Amino acid sequence: MADDWESAADSEIILQNAASTVNKWEGEDDDDDVKESWEDEEEKKDEENEKPTITDVPVKTKPSKALKAKLEEQARLEEEKEAKRLASLTPEEKLAEKLRLQKIQEDSDLNHALDTFGVTRAETNGNGLDSFNPETKEQFKEFGSALSWKVGQYRESAEFPQFVEDLVRGLCIHLSAADIKKVKMSVEILHSEKLKMEKAIAKKAAGKNKGKATLRTESDDIDDYKKYGNDFSEDYDDFM
């Protein structure tokens, strides 16, 4: 009986050792599984962090076809209205309109030039032009607009034409013959346009005066006779 107990105890002990060994290995496997799952989660987090964040972009709503068609129709009507207005203008009125638009463009160029160089209109009345330091072609163009505006303020003076002539001559001294020729051609084109404008204005004024009726009196007829040597006073003296 004792032998049976001893053998049973030995076998039980062996079983417990085997079980503990198996459990130990199983525990080690569980640790490995936990480690691998933890590494997988870390990799997933890294991948999620590496993904670029997508920000919501506001979607621009396109105008409806009906609204777009209405706007295009309004623009077309405005263009037709402006075309009719220009067509009804006389030649001198068209030229005046051209000069008006040119003046608006010059003012716009001047404002742009002043903004570019950080100069105000008030400064151009003093020494503000010294603030300009043009280097590029566009900057020289803007500087020229500002300078023309400044000089043009004295156009009503009787000395202005001679001043411009002297100014152009003084500036052209620094140019080559080829460049002076370009300036000459530009001035000739301007002269031709001005001549057409002045003729159109004079023609319009003559047309208005031509339609006026004149009243002749008896004294006017007598004056005409006197021009040809017929003096009624002499005839009257002879008669007496």
Swiss-Prot record:
Gene Ontology terms: biological process: formation of cytoplasmic translation initiation complex; regulation of translational initiation
InterPro entries, A to Z: eIF3-like_dom_sf, eIF3j
Disordered: annotated segments: 1-66
Origin: domain of life: Eukaryota
Biased composition (Acidic residues): 27-45
Keywords annotated in UniProt: Cytoplasm, Initiation factor, Protein biosynthesis
Gene3D superfamilies from the UniProt entry: Eukaryotic translation initiation factor 3 like domains
GO cellular component, one term: eukaryotic 48S preinitiation complex
TM stretches of this protein: none
Annotated family: Belongs to the eIF-3 subunit J family.
Subunit structure: Component of the eukaryotic translation initiation factor 3 (eIF-3) complex. The eIF-3 complex interacts with pix.
Function: Component of the eukaryotic translation initiation factor 3 (eIF-3) complex, which is involved in protein synthesis of a specialized repertoire of mRNAs and, together with other initiation factors, stimulates binding of mRNA and methionyl-tRNAi to the 40S ribosome. The eIF-3 complex specifically targets and initiates translation of a subset of mRNAs involved in cell proliferation.
Protein's recorded name: Eukaryotic translation initiation factor 3 subunit J
Native source species: Drosophila persimilis (Fruit fly)
